Amino acid sequence: MGVANDSSPEYQWMSPHRLSDTVILGDCLYFNNIMSQLDLHQNWAPSVRLLNYFKNFNKETLLKIEENDYINSSFFQQKDKRFYPINDDFYHISTGGYGIVFKIDNYVVKFVFEATKLYSPMETTAEFTVPKFLYNNLKGDEKKLIVCAWAMGLNYKLTFLHTLYKRVLHMLLLLIQTMDGQELSLRYSSKVFLKAFNERKDSIKFVKLLSHFYPAVINSNINVINYFNRMFHFFEHEKRTNYEYERGNIIIFPLALYSADKVDTELAIKLGFKSLVQYIKFIFLQMALLYIKIYELPCCDNFLHADLKPDNILLFDSNEPIIIHLKDKKFVFNERIKSALNDFDFSQVAGIINKKIKNNFKVEHNWYYDFHFFVHTLLKTYPEIEKDIEFSTALEEFIMCTKTDCDKYRLKVSILHPISFLEKFIMRDIFSDWINGGN
């Protein structure tokens, strides 16, 4: 029997490092460096004491704080030009259906609550093992189009995140009530709270108040004010009413420039593209080449990402040309950025069978499932594509579907087009800027 390594499917079942009931995959130095900056056991006094604390303030005392010159610019929203990370803190950058993501220095740290009653810790490793397996088996520059996590910690106690969220929520509730001269209460209406928070979050006076109260009340190096409404939707969603925010995984990634969906016309030009549509062709072509090269690997014609869409494609600096050979052609990318596929949480390849995807799919799928969804989301994200008649017409070949066989952009029926369909598609003149270096 061969020795399993991270280029083999069996790698996902290995436990290279053990710490009681937790496991670390990948680089322990990266992981331990991040963990040393987190207090997983931080707790706070009961909420009733926080309520009593805010009874010491009123509109007048808050006005005095607002008149103070001190302002912590990290409490502005990150899309605000006034935002600046003045501390080495964890800054909340995103919360989706399955993960809460923070940025610290040049790292991205993702916390994923796992349904431990459904899966064992080692059955939740696809986000680490699948891209690592692909990266180690792909031979050419196509491997540069994959985001590999540096490290992943399994089965960690993550209750501190939900506790922190509740503490910040209660602070914001009481602060807003004090500003409005209302009776203090920890009861809230989701709609009323979000309206009040969104009306104030960009106000310099409100940020001054946060600069005072967040350190005093929260006293944490985890800043969740940015995109707090997304975290609110995550924890308050009715489908998680009885959810146990107990254990999950911690994943360390390199920090990207942007996700692909954040690029507009102005940024596309700034990045060196002739137009936004040329940029869209660029990310489509790179993803297509990645899939084709994966399907060339032995036993990898079952690869599925299961969530291929613009916000799961990240952009990184590219310091040298990316050259990918396909049959008698070579695709040359001289752009100063590259796109890279991220978020393999629901992916599968070769012998790495993902129970999460297996339980969700009732019929067999292949690459076409991913690109059908990808094209739908591209057209939704970028209506500008319609201005390029040739490109938009070609993309429609991926979405010849009806309500009967497609639900929310996802195929419900099995359509197993061969990968040669995609190979022929990218040989068209649509992508002539990159075929044989544009010659």
From Swiss-Prot:
* Protein family per UniProt: Belongs to the protein kinase superfamily. Ser/Thr protein kinase family.
Task: Write down the species.
Answer: Vaccinia virus (strain Western Reserve)
Disulphide-bonded residues = none
The taxonomy runs: Viruses, Varidnaviria, Bamfordvirae, Nucleocytoviricota, Pokkesviricetes
Up-regulation conditions: Expressed in the late phase of the viral replicative cycle.
Instruction: Tell me the protein's name.
Output: Serine/threonine-protein kinase 2
Enzyme Commission code(s) on record: 2.7.11.1
Q: Where does ATP bind?
A: 93-101, 117
Any single GO molecular-function term of the entry would be: protein serine/threonine kinase activity
Entry's localization field? Host endoplasmic reticulum; Host endoplasmic reticulum-Golgi intermediate compartment
Report the catalytic activity. Answer: L-seryl-[protein] + ATP = O-phospho-L-seryl-[protein] + ADP + H(+); L-threonyl-[protein] + ATP = O-phospho-L-threonyl-[protein] + ADP + H(+)
The protein's UniProt keywords, in alphabetical order, are: ATP-binding, Host endoplasmic reticulum, Kinase, Late protein, Nucleotide-binding, Phosphoprotein, Serine/threonine-protein kinase, Transferase
Pfam families from the entry? Pox_ser-thr_kin
Per the Swiss-Prot or TrEMBL record, the active site comprises: 307
Describe the task this protein carries out. Answer: Essential serine-protein kinase involved in the early stage of virion morphogenesis.
Give the record's PTM text. Answer: Phosphorylated in vivo. Autophosphorylated in vitro.
Q: Which residues form the Protein kinase domain?
A: 87-439
Q: Name one GO cellular component term.
A: host cell endoplasmic reticulum
